Amino acid sequence: MHFEFSTASRIIFGSGCLEQIGTLGRDWGRRVLIVTGRDPERASALREHLDEAGVTSVVYSVAGEPTLQTIEEGSEVVRAEACDWVIGFGGGSAMDAGKAIAIMHTQEGEILDYLEVIGKGRPIRREGLPYIAVPTTSGTGAEVTRNAVLGFPEHGIKVSLRSPLMLPRVALVDPSLTLGLPFEITASTGLDALTQLIEAAVSSRANPMTDALCEKGIQLAAASLERCCFQPGEIGPREDMALAALYSGIALANAGLGAVHGFAAPIGGMFSAPHGAVCAALLPHVWRANLKAIQPQQKGKFDRVAQGLLGDASARAEQVQDWIEGLCLRLRIRPLAALGVSASDVTEIARRAAQASSMKANPVNHGPAALEAILMEAIRVS
């Protein structure tokens, strides 16, 4: 057995822990860039804590998924405002943007020199500005991942900037920040976290540490996600879901993902659709295809996922597709066709998905025909 494992240098978890933010970064300097989502007012409490610690903050808002222009503009703000460190405060998009801005500040050349797929893919050699990730949703786990996803709408693709040096110095997870999130966002982001846990659990790169995280994370997400959606003001389920999302990020950063995210990358680039909803619409069909094609010795892992989801030690992998489809129905997840995907898109999506980095860790190597069949099944069910 041989594996490597890494995560953020420091993880702080707990309701109310946001108040520590000023003292955590004060030694790095007295000027910080806050990268947040569309509504900068959501960062008002964060800014108050920084003010109390004597840290001056500058806010840079990201409207949706970051693009090359987003990172370039944010980098210019860092230079113009002489910021010493960076906070990513929001969902996956804000945290990824903050991550990319922090790392690119110290690199030579342009961001395209370091991007996968459409760039030169040069390795990142220098540590970036100190970076703290603060999630306000329970979904992507970007607070503990080593990559930032950037969208290129003009090409209809998403690509990653990736390096171990991009792991945050601190991941500060305050579940109380997710209280009151709208139903749709809670459901979509939560299903993304659940998908990440399931894919990492059966990944070809899984190891004993990611196995342990996935086992507990799946149990937490299965028990708490619906309660978060239908009882949005209760802190207990929010804490469990935040922990599940954290585990999902650590697991995917060390074990990889699979075909669901392999498909989701090109679909997200080609269509304006919530990432978590795309993953949820694909998950039952990828699960079924993987289950049909795995080797007998792989079956135990799939059964253990079923046991975590159903909360039943006798559950088997064959029950998972129905369970996931039922959950998606209750959480009002739109089917793939309703998200804009049609049969005419299948060949191109499958072609792009086959090249996606997430596909490499799928437990089964599906050929082009199998990938197209999975997509067609998802569309027909829609």
Regions found by a protein language model. Give the residues of each.
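Carboxylate- and glycine-rich phosphate/diphosphate-binding segment that chelates Mg2+/Mn2+
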Residues: 147-255
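Gly/Pro-rich interdomain helix-loop hinge
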Residues: 270-345, 381
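Glycine/threonine-rich beta-strand-loop-alpha-helix active-site module
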Residues: 69-176
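ATP/NTP phosphate-donor binding region
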Residues: 1-85
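Short, amphipathic C-terminal "tail helix"
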Residues: 343-382
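Glycine-rich phosphate/pyrophosphate-binding beta-alpha loops
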Residues: 139, 246-279, 356-360
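Short glycine/serine/threonine-rich phosphate/pyrophosphate-binding segments
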Residues: 18-21, 40-44, 68-71, 93-98, ...
